[in-house]
Structures are given as C-alpha cells and as structure tokens.
C-alpha cells in the first residue's frame, strides 16, 4: 500500500499480514427503520458489506433506495436499528452519542453535495475548522500550514484566502475535500459529491478522488452518475434497501494522470 504520509504528513504505521486487517468497513446485517404515520419504513434491509483499506467503492441507486442512509450508518451520523457497524477495530454501533462525535471528528471525512462551507470563513479557515474542533495541531500556525498543504494537494491553494462565495462550485468542492482530509481520517464518505457540478468539473473532482486513493485513502462514494461509478474499483447498487452484488470495475490506476 502506498505511504499515506505523501498525502497526510502523518505516518501510516505497519499493517498486519492477516487478510482481516485489510477490511476497514464491515457492516453485518444492518437494518434501519424509520417511524412514519403509516408504520415503520425499513430503509435498509440486512446490509452486509465489507470494504478493504485503500478501496474506492461507489454506491448507486434510485432516490430513496437507501444510499444516504447507508452513508449515515458508516459515518455514525445515524444508528442502525439492528446489525453491526465496524470501522477498523471500532464497533461504531456501540458508541454513545458523545463518543461517536469524538470518533467521527478524528476518523471520518464527510463530503456533501452542497459543500457545507461556512460562508464567513475563508477557504483556509474552513479547512482549519475540524482541526480546531478535534483539538489537533497545537497552534493556529500549525493548523494553517496543514490547511495550505491540503489545499495544495487538491490544487486550490491559490484561493486559500478567499471566501467560498468568491470561488466556483468546483473549487468549493475541492475546499470541502481538503476540509474532509484535515484530521487524516481513516476513510472518506462522499454523498453525491459531484451532483451539483457540471460534467467537466465532476471529472476533475473524480480525478482528485483517484489521486487520493492512489495515496492510500479509502473512499465510499454515493452517486447518481453511472459513468463515474463505473470508473471506481467496485460498484454496488442499492435497490429497496438491499445491496445488489458488487461489480469489479477496471483498474483505478487508469484514471490517474
């Protein structure tokens, strides 16, 4: 596996030889029910999923099929009604609310369709914010240095001192990716990250993801874009809350230029 330090400036540590150690995301019999006036609605129906470290996995499906609910399970944003969610050696489904917030802040990078940048902060300050919340890096200077480093990695460093409103949608999404990487997360969860972008800009964002995967990051991406999904390592489809068997795509290395 490539050295994560090329991206994060932090050591990746040694890896066990056991195959099991290569599984980063492990969902076992995950169900999620929501109460409605008409009764319980089962959004996820017994999801079993394993994602290897360093994989780029796409989740596709129609609106309402359960894609975002699945993302919420692996990120700890929501809890399963039944089943188990393991990330690395952490049983996320067993964490208390205060524990899961701390765990997510240090281990998960979430990327949204509509960027979710704070408009009153500069691009660099938006990237620094997760470090501040997680009390990582000792000084404002260190946090800014890391923010600039990450913005450079996603080719947006020249916009560091601008407000989000002063840059394009594609540039804002690059800032959002840098922010998601701020605390060197174990994996990135991207929920429709190109859904608000034109096709050319979406391709550019996908190239950023491909670069991150080449440097050892694990990415789980929800998308309606079948072309982008077909270019990941592995493509899954959710139909009525159930996963359709995986398809192995062409090597992601072909995307990296």
Residue ranges of predicted features:
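ABC-family P-loop ATPase nucleotide-binding domain
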Residues: 1-33, 245-257
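ABC family nucleotide-binding domain
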Residues: 23-238
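H-loop (His-switch) and adjacent beta-strand-loop-beta switch element
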Residues: 235-248
